[in-house]
Amino acid sequence: MGKAQPLPILITGGGRRIGLALAWHFINQKQPVIVSYRTHYPAIDGLIKAGAQCIQADFSTNDGVMAFADEVLKSPHGLRAILHNASAWMAEKPGAPLADVLACMMQIHVNTPYLLNHALERLLRGHGHAASDIIHFTDYVVERGSDKHIAYAASKAALDNMTRSFARKLAPEVKVNSIAPSLILFNEHDDAEYRQQALNKSLMKTAPGEKEVIDLVDYLLTSCFVTGRSFPLDGGRHLR
């Protein structure tokens, strides 16, 4: 009998930056990948050519979330993991309706993973003890709060709390953990002054790049014991 085909890993927000790096990491390991994307960046075409299943999704409404879930539920054998990487960033700015800012942040960071975890639960179960994973990507600000991004920080804190609740609900078949990154990589338009200020906020004074995230994700996927925990990736920033 031949070796069973690996189950796919679902990555939300896989069209760019960390999500894209994770997708390519798994593809290079011959691991099937399902990627959600909102905007069709050129990188999506590369993923499709490499064999990834890429599904355009609108997580700004619950109907959009459930439509995406319905597509994923067509997977006949199940899922190896769900990596909740999709994110948005909004600040409380003059002229921006505060209720809209809060609703947007809660929709993408709370409603979306909450609904997907429930809708896709049966795809994660039935594969054995600690055989499946959910990883939530939260943020360093969960620990400290943010006076400029209050709604964002609150929504990521809610996601952090859901990590422990889903860990209780889904154990021992499914492990549920979160990763709380600070500065991982810069945007192309970030100028030298901003970059230096950002680097000085941590003890390690570097932007480690996607590999630091990939290594931690690999650890969590291979562990058969760790669940219900949040793992900071902040370079010692909490000690500054």
Curated annotation (Swiss-Prot):
Keyword hit for Zinc: no
Top-tier EC class: oxidoreductase
Disulfide bond entries: none
EC number per UniProt: 1.5.1.50, 1.5.1.3
Active site per database record: 152 (proton acceptor)
Single Gene Ontology MF annotation: dihydrofolate reductase activity
Organism domain of life: Bacteria
A Gene Ontology BP annotation from the UniProt entry: one-carbon metabolic process
UniProt KW keywords: NADP, One-carbon metabolism, Oxidoreductase
Reactions mediated catalytically: (6S)-5,6,7,8-tetrahydrofolate + NADP(+) = 7,8-dihydrofolate + NADPH + H(+); 7,8-dihydromonapterin + NADPH + H(+) = 5,6,7,8-tetrahydromonapterin + NADP(+)
Family note: Belongs to the short-chain dehydrogenases/reductases (SDR) family. FolM subfamily.
Purpose: Catalyzes the reduction of dihydromonapterin to tetrahydromonapterin. Also has lower activity with dihydrofolate.
Name this protein carries in UniProt: Dihydromonapterin reductase
Taxonomic source organism: Shigella sonnei (strain Ss046)
